[in-house]
Amino acid sequence: MNDKSNLPPVTEAIDENHIIAERREKLAKLRKGGVAFPNDFAPTHLAADLHSYYDSLTKKELAAKKIHVKVAGRMVLKRVMGKTSFATIQDRSGQIQFYINDELSGADVHGAFKHWDMGDFISTEGNLFKTNKGELSVECSNLRLLSKSLRPLPDKFHGLSDLETKYRQRYVDLIVNPESRSTFKARSNAIASLRRHMLDADFMEVETPMLHPIPGGAAAKPFITHHNALDMQMFLRIAPELYLKRLVVGGFERVFEINHNFRNEGVSPRHNPEFTMMEFYAAYTDYRWLMDFTEGLIRAAAIDAQGTAVLTHQGRELDLSKPFQRLTITEAILKYCGQSGKSYEAAQLEDANFIRVELKKGGENPDAPTLKNAGIGALQLALFELVAEEHLWEPTYIIDYPIEVSPLARESDTRPGITERFELFITGREIANGFSELNDAEDQANRFRKQVEQKEAGDEEAMYFDHDFIRALEYGMPPTGGCGIGIDRLIMLLTDAPNIRDVILFPHLRREED
């Protein structure tokens, strides 16, 4: 039989609009025949479970058991051979084949099946058996069309290779690309692991506002909106930090939140304006405790998502099982600058003029608002970002950040101008940021004032003065450590994804042309 559905669904030789028109005609006939989209079928098994339970049985052993099953899914493969046919359906767990002929289900049902298309949702019922080639299959005694597909799927030879289409039509990507389904299953497992470990450590999960009257908790440019009922300007949150610390003030000594943040900034393989973060705060801890705890979280997430802490990322081994190294900013510059073709002496890194010259050589503008009046600590950080950051492949904590770039972090008791802060880098990407929290209300107010001065001088990412947060601190906050982990970047590591859009189900794209 010449079955059109056996041809590749989308090729240069076949016009997609013509295929859609043909399928609409088929749907119209189904509507005339009764219920075109029935909703009264309940599967008894998933494809993967059937393979797990019965793949090991011989053909004879399986036949003796007479195992009756009901399965349903999207038809992704179809072979019609006269009076017999084979097809494969795909459910959320995997794929399974079924066999149909005129005798088993009746010539009318088999005849109707021959006109069904790839992408249609089908239910099948019958006994399990194994083909002569040993493939587990369902011997179909009852077959129904549950949902008609109007658009053809990409053919298996060409797949869905256009990245923009892949991101924009994620539903098609998930249908045809098992790698994408695997990525998002791993993402779900990793987040579940993080949540489980937080709860096991006696943290309480909370939800804080997405709309803020004042943007705060990070240095970033916010999205702005308007609250009609209150007639006031609002900001999509750039970070939940200040609200979570209010909860610590209120007596919830261990809190965490996994949710979205929004930053009205650039899009790149590492940045998406809407992204997922986990932030957590623990009273009576400091940044060293946080580093130990965060290291354990990430290692456990890797094992729970991928079964191992030793991964391969972009062709290179990434070992999360070893202790994460810890370096100061200047130690990291001296250790890694050679990979950027640079060589420095420790004394040079204490010379502000020298660093400004090096920044200019690297294409940075030392007179930009963020650097024009910068102290030595901020300049060292800028040089680190220029010559060392991208080379931090193995997990590395960069510690002891300057106070001028850490307005919410506690200052060191022994090193004036340095805060008890860290950032975690893996494969050259920032994955986490944490510190011993500043709980001195007067010190925090002074730092907010300096941030306002920087904003007035042209730094768009400087923080606002949050009077209510200061009021909260004035009631007293216990010594506290807090950390934020970038979930999307973490998933990139765990799934070997080169682009952040590969791990976000529906990333932002330019408006689609009509």
Curated annotation (Swiss-Prot):
Keyword Metal-binding: yes
GO biological process: lysyl-tRNA aminoacylation
Cofactor note: Binds 3 Mg(2+) ions per subunit.
Binding site for Mg(2+) 1: E423, E430
Protein name: Lysine--tRNA ligase
Domain of life, source organism: Bacteria
Family matches, as PANTHER family: LYSINE--TRNA LIGASE, CHLOROPLASTIC_MITOCHONDRIAL (PTHR42918:SF15), LYSYL-TRNA SYNTHETASE (PTHR42918)
Coiled coil stretches, renumbered: none
Sites where the protein binds Mg(2+) 2: E430
TM annotation in the entry: none
Keyword field: Aminoacyl-tRNA synthetase, ATP-binding, Cytoplasm, Ligase, Magnesium, Metal-binding, Nucleotide-binding, Protein biosynthesis
Catalytic activity: tRNA(Lys) + L-lysine + ATP = L-lysyl-tRNA(Lys) + AMP + diphosphate
Similarity-based family: Belongs to the class-II aminoacyl-tRNA synthetase family.
InterPro entries: Aa-tRNA-synt_II, aa-tRNA-synth_II, aa-tRNA-synth_II/BPL/LPL, Lys-tRNA-ligase_II, Lys-tRNA-ligase_II_N, Lys-tRNA-synth_II_C, NA-bd_OB-fold, NA-bd_OB_tRNA
A GO CC annotation given for this chain: cytosol
Pfam family, one: tRNA_anti-codon
Cofactors required: Mg(2+)
Class in the EC hierarchy, top level: ligase
Primary localization: cytoplasm
Signal peptide: none
Gene assigned in the entry: lysS
Keyword Nucleotide-binding: yes
Disulfide bonds: none
Subunit structure: Homodimer.
UniProt-listed Enzyme Commission number(s): 6.1.1.6
